[in-house]
């Protein structure tokens, strides 16, 4: 299954232009890393504050979307901006389908997955109580409803993280060991572990991994 992610920065107009440029550059750096880790992945920044990602192996779409959300939450922590941006970072929508057309050289993403992720992002963008959406093309309403609730719960966990918790979870999701994270953040390994436990890292990580085990082709069968 192919996935696309459509996302936008919450209340981005509250950022001064210099901070928005800084944030966009951080996102581009993360996308460069994703291109190395997930073959065929590519992403683009649209409309100034929007993001569209093409994920050839859709199982990893949730991990990628959560990492984007964590990055933005951490990066804006010392910026003067709206409280909603500090808390939520981004709202995102994931669409999945068996077929989708994407051409990085021509800057084209087309097909049912991007239609779903884009449409559902538009639907939640006007709300202050929903920050994640998920839909699989041709899946039943009950399956899509269950999976969307699952994705939303994980997104809500990120919303509840402090900045210190968010930066630790960000690096752990990228695969860094606690000693390495401590070196990056300039703190002791014991402090990294404490922040991870207070963020319920074990549960959070298990939920991400369980999502990656789902056979999306079968549930659409």
Where are these predicted regions, by residue range?
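Regulatory and interdomain segments flanking nucleotide-handling catalytic cores
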Residues: 1-221
């Amino acid at each position: 299954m192919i996935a696309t992610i459509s996302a936008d920065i919450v209340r981005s107009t509250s950022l001064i232009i210099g901070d928005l440029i800084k944030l966009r550059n951080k996102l581009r750096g993360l996308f460069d890393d994703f291109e190395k880790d997930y073959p065929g992945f590519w992403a683009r920044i649209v409309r100034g504050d929007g993001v569209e990602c093409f994920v050839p192996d859709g199982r990893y779409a949730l991990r990628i979307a959560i990492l984007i959300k964590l990055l933005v939450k951490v990066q804006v922590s010392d910026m003067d901006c709206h409280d909603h941006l500090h808390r939520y970072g981004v709202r995102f929508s994931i669409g999945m389908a068996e077929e989708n057309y994407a051409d990085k050289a021509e800057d084209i993403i087309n097909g049912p997955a991007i239609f779903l992720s884009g449409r559902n992002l538009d639907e939640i963008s006007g709300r202050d109580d929903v920050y994640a959406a998920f839909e699989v093309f041709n899946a039943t309403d009950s399956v899509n409803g269950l999976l969307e609730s699952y994705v939303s719960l994980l997104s809500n966990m990120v919303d509840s993280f402090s900045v210190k918790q968010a930066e630790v979870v960000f690096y752990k999701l990228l695969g860094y060991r606690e000693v390495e994270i401590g070196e990056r953040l300039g703190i002791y390994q014991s402090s990294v572990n404490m922040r991870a436990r207070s963020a319920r890292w074990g549960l959070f990580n298990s939920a991400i991994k369980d999502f990656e085990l789902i056979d999306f082709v079968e549930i659409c069968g």
